[in-house]
Curated annotation (Swiss-Prot):
This is Translation initiation factor IF-1, chloroplastic. It comes from Sambucus canadensis. InterPro entries: NA-bd_OB-fold, RNA-binding_domain_S1_IF1, S1_domain, TIF_IF1. One of the essential components for the initiation of protein synthesis. Stabilizes the binding of IF-2 and IF-3 on the 30S subunit to which N-formylmethionyl-tRNA(fMet) subsequently binds. Helps modulate mRNA selection, yielding the 30S pre-initiation complex (PIC). Upon addition of the 50S ribosomal subunit IF-1, IF-2 and IF-3 are released leaving the mature 70S translation initiation complex. It comes from the Eukaryota. GO terms for molecular function: ribosome binding; rRNA binding; translation initiation factor activity. The keyword DNA damage does not apply. It is found in: Plastid, Chloroplast. Keywords: Chloroplast, Initiation factor, Plastid, Protein biosynthesis, RNA-binding, rRNA-binding. The gene is infA. Residues 1-71 form the S1-like domain. HAMAP family: IF_1.
Amino acid sequence: MKEQKWIHEGLITESLPNGMFRVRLDNEDMILGYVSGKIRRSFIRILPGDRVKIEVSRYDSTRGRIIYRLRNKDSKD
């Protein structure tokens, strides 16, 4: 049976080494996020200030996998 995961939206606050980021969720929790394989392979650039969707395990709510970078309204990408 596949593990159930929560999907949250948040804001990247800090960039850490090896594709890790500190993310502030919309409910004001701070968690550690890492980049998923598809984002890494597609060379999608994630910078502090970006809004992302993050997948969090029910068993460890302090870490999550960044699965999508949301488009900013003011950027031209």
